[in-house]
Structure formats: C-alpha cells, structure tokens
C-alpha cells in the first residue's frame, strides 16, 4: 500500500478510530521492541564466572569451563582479572549447569562484555584474554587398586567433575601416552626404592603387597628389576613431553623422577630393594644433563632414611617441626601479555598461600636449573614450591607437597573432603594446570 492509498483510507475513517488504531500500533511496536531487547539472547550475551572472593566454588568453576569445552563451546580466560575469571557466551544450559554445581556467575549485556574486553586488553593493564577451545585428554599415572583420594590431583578432578583416564607402566611403555594431552604423577617413586618406606613400613601388609605387585609387573614387561623398569618409564615420559605433552607432578614424583633420569646407567638401590648392592660410586656417576629441572644434587643412599636427596627442603627425615599458622608461600606475578604461560599457571584469588608438607615439600633453589621458571617460593628461604619448564615441544610443571588442605599428610590419614575447601587457593594451582593445555596458542609479543 502506497502513501496515497493510506491517505484515501484515512479520509473515510472517523478521527477517533484512526487515532485509536495508531495508538494501538505504537503500543504493539513498543511491546515487541521491549521483548526483543530483554530476551536472554540479547540482554545476556555473555556469562562471567568471576574467580575473586565473590566466587562460591572456585574448584567447580574449572569443571564448568571444562564442561563447556566438552559440549563444543569456548571460554575466554581473563588472566589477572578478578582472580583469573572465565567469560563465555550466555546460554540457558550453561547458566543452569552453574546453578546445579553451585558456581556463582554474572550475566553481562553486549555493551558490558565489550567494555570488559577493552579493559582487559588495554596495553597499560597487566591483564589479557586467552581463548580456551580444546578439551584436554587427561591421563593420571596410578598403580592398580588406586583410590581417587590417594592424591590431591585426582581428588581435585573428581570434585570438579573433570574426566580422566588411569594409566600405568604398560600404557606408558607401549606409547599410549601419545593419546593424551596432559599427564599427572603424584606420590610416585621412579628410583625403584618403593617410596623409601622400608624403615617404618617394611612389615606392613600394604608395603609387602606393593613390592610384590611392582616386581610382578616389571618381570611381565621384560625387566629384571623394578628400578630398571621405573627408569624406562621415566624415559618414556620424558619422550612424551619432548613430543609436545604436558606433565604435571607433585610430591615425590618430582625429585624421584629427575633422580631416575640422572641415574639411568647407575644402580642406586640397595639389596633390600633390588636384590643386589648399590654402586658405591653412584653419586659420581650421575648425569645431570639428562634431568629436566634439577642439577648437582646429592643422593641420600641410606635405605633407612625417608629421603631421596637434598633436593627436598626441608628434609623429610627427621620430620620438620613447623607451625602451620606461619607457613606460607608466595606466588610470583608475571606479565599477562608477554608471559601468558606462567601467568595462567599462577591464577588465584590470593597471592600468599598456606604451605603444606609432603615427602617432597619444596625444592632447594640452588639445585634448580637456570632454565626453569620459579612460580612460587617461601619468601626469605631457599624453598621453592612451584616451578615450570620446557622440554622439546612440551612442558612440565612441578608442585611441592602432598595435599594443599592437609598440612602434614600421613600414611593412613582419611581423605580430604573438598566440599569443605571449595575455595582452596592451593588446589586452584592444580586446576590451572588442567586447563592450561586447552589454551589456544597465540604469537608471543616482542
């Protein structure tokens, strides 16, 4: 209908009827406009998961990010913004999942999201955006009979509802690690000394069963001694890292791993461990060029001491006496735009974190290779808590201590209930590593 036809019609319509129709038309337009601009797809274009003190469950927030990637979505990790927050496209399904898991979120309109992106990416602001776009395939190195509460990482994965696959020696030695993006190791002993529990637990049923299991497995895989088989596993893991894998280790899986690499051609195990005496010149025969993180360390060859070397600080034998209320370590701050990797690994809502012990509590700074990035340390001491390094096309991150919420974990202690520690800063460092392989690589700024 053209404007002339419209005019002819209106000339034959009573004025009050015409204006009544026009008013109704304007009301309908206004209602439609309001419904469009207040619909969830428009008013709530983004969903922000803040990771500062407002967050109700920091640990499950990582699980939400993982869940989103699993379902084909993407998330932006806002480094150094409100504790390392996550920004995602808003959907009703995502909002529902957050509510189910008790994760606090804030819906953002398009203009708010645009303003937030601009703020984070300002050149004078130590913040940046990292896109998470790939679901990492996670493997956890554990022996048969392992329970999820046996180490902090599997407890964190279980609590955050992040799926993982268990692997052990056969999978590692047969090349199966190539199927995974991320490998975790915890309270392991790659030296073949069964955790150096001999002095206190050699008569315990669990110790005897473990030794028999390890000996059977080594023989089945074609090795005469457990120590030789574990060294082969350590070398296979090193090859996995070199080919682009991500390794995260805690507690004794850190120093015992490097010791196994350095002692590749040296017998460092006494007769009660492998049936023959150790090489008395073992220390002089160590090859530090084969290690990833440590050098110039001295082995503790006493089979009755619960210690592998002088890497561990403070030494585990005798057990150190410390006040948990005064034991803290400090995270270093990195440039989000120029050093995104260490920045990702240190995202947290606090930068001073309560300490915790383990068979390997921390690392002696003077024994750490210069190529390694120190992520956290106990200020005023030689104790380094958290380190990161590169090897080949892959990376490794090592974290001292056994359980961030169990200060002095002992054999037989009950598992930590993470429902009571859902905002744990120490556990957040573990989960930073889980999401790290999901990050899209971008060109380094120069």
Predicted regions and their residues:
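N-terminal secretory signal peptides that target proteins for export/translocation
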Residues: 1-21
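Extracellular ligand-binding/catalytic regions of CAZymes and related secreted enzymes
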Residues: 44-50, 56-87, 267, 367-446
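Helical hinge/lid and interdomain linker segments adjacent to catalytic or ligand-binding clefts
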Residues: 46-47, 52, 56, 86-87, ...
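Bacterial N-terminal signal peptides
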Residues: 23-35
